[in-house]
Amino acid sequence: MKDKNCLFDLINKIESIDNVSIKKAQTELDRKMKPKDSLGVLEDICKKTAGIYGYPLKKLEKKCHIVVAADNGIIEEGVSSCPIEYTSIVSEAMLNQIACIGIFTKTLGIDLNVVDIGMKNDIKRNYPNLIHKKIRRGTNNFYKERAMSINECLEAIFTGIDIINEKSKDYDMFSNGEMGIANTTTSSALLYSVTRQNIDDIVGRGGGLSDEGLNKKKKVIIEACERYNTFEMDAVEMLASVGGFDLACMLGIYVGAALNKKLILVDGFISSVAALLACSLNKNIQDYLLFTHKSEEPGVNIILDYLKEKTFLNMNMRLGEGTGAVLACPIIDCAIEMINTMKSPEEVYNLFNK
């Protein structure tokens, strides 16, 4: 059986990206027909991509977006304004390309997969891009008992790793998102556990909570985290105590991307919490992550500060699903095309000064 030691042994194998290739990319960028560093984030993207894949850069043509869907027992405490049935309904709408992430991925030519890691309800129709990995029908109510067992948490993490291991032969890069009721509550509890920052700076309204619901959400998180003393736990123990199957699987997806040396785009608040936990297990994982857009959820600022990261899209979005991450894909494509195609001043002079 895959235990925690097996997971940590695997994670410890993750290496940092190649600094020699980063320097080669920097040299090439500096000789282009532009002022030094004038393309800002696009140059950063080129260097990160070079570090992961080597230089010269190849086009990242085959892109895969993975939405992880699960439900959370903490909904019993009134911390979400959405009914739990919403998870499977919206997930099926994604698969039919009529929910936002389905529309975006179709428009951008990105392959979409939805993973049922723990939805309460089943999607009864068959879809080729629906991955059935249900551990059980939602987590426990973490206010009353721990969200899941350590073994269930490990199963969710290894599921994420295995999905990337399987798909890495067919795809150049990945992005991920989530779908699940009350997962801003689980994410906020995890962020509170890692950083112990002021709860008012961490917890947002999620799907649209009232003032009363927001205060209840904060109270539930504080009391549960203090009861379990999550502040002294590692990422796996935290997830088992106050997390969700979706967050555990996303952590595994980040680990899998780093193990397979693939770029993976980080979306908003919930995706960023999973990324924070992954990086707490091996800092090298951060080398393979590209943080894309700044969510409207307040806790994302704490994560970005904690990891010393910046996003390059700010669109007042807080939908989830990975919608912000996939919108970054054309920017990445342009960055790679730029470094591969743009000429130096001397080359342009020789071409046209005739």
Curated annotation (Swiss-Prot):
Report any one BP term from Gene Ontology: cobalamin biosynthetic process
InterPro entries on file: Nict_dMeBzImd_PRibTrfase, Nict_dMeBzImd_PRibTrfase_bact, Nict_dMeBzImd_PRibTrfase_N, Nict_dMeBzImd_PRibTrfase_sf
Annotated Gene Ontology MF terms? nicotinate-nucleotide-dimethylbenzimidazole phosphoribosyltransferase activity
Active site (catalytic residues): E321
In which domain of life is the source organism classified?
Answer: Bacteria
Keyword Transferase attached: yes
> Which PANTHER family does the UniProt entry name for this protein?
NICOTINATE-NUCLEOTIDE--DIMETHYLBENZIMIDAZOLE PHOSPHORIBOSYLTRANSFERASE (PTHR43463:SF1)
Q: Which HAMAP family match?
A: CobT
Entry protein name: Nicotinate-nucleotide--dimethylbenzimidazole phosphoribosyltransferase
Organism (species): Fusobacterium nucleatum subsp. nucleatum (strain ATCC 25586 / DSM 15643 / BCRC 10681 / CIP 101130 / JCM 8532 / KCTC 2640 / LMG 13131 / VPI 4355)
Write the lineage as a comma-separated list: Bacteria, Fusobacteriati, Fusobacteriota, Fusobacteriia, Fusobacteriales
**Its encoding gene is what?**
cobT
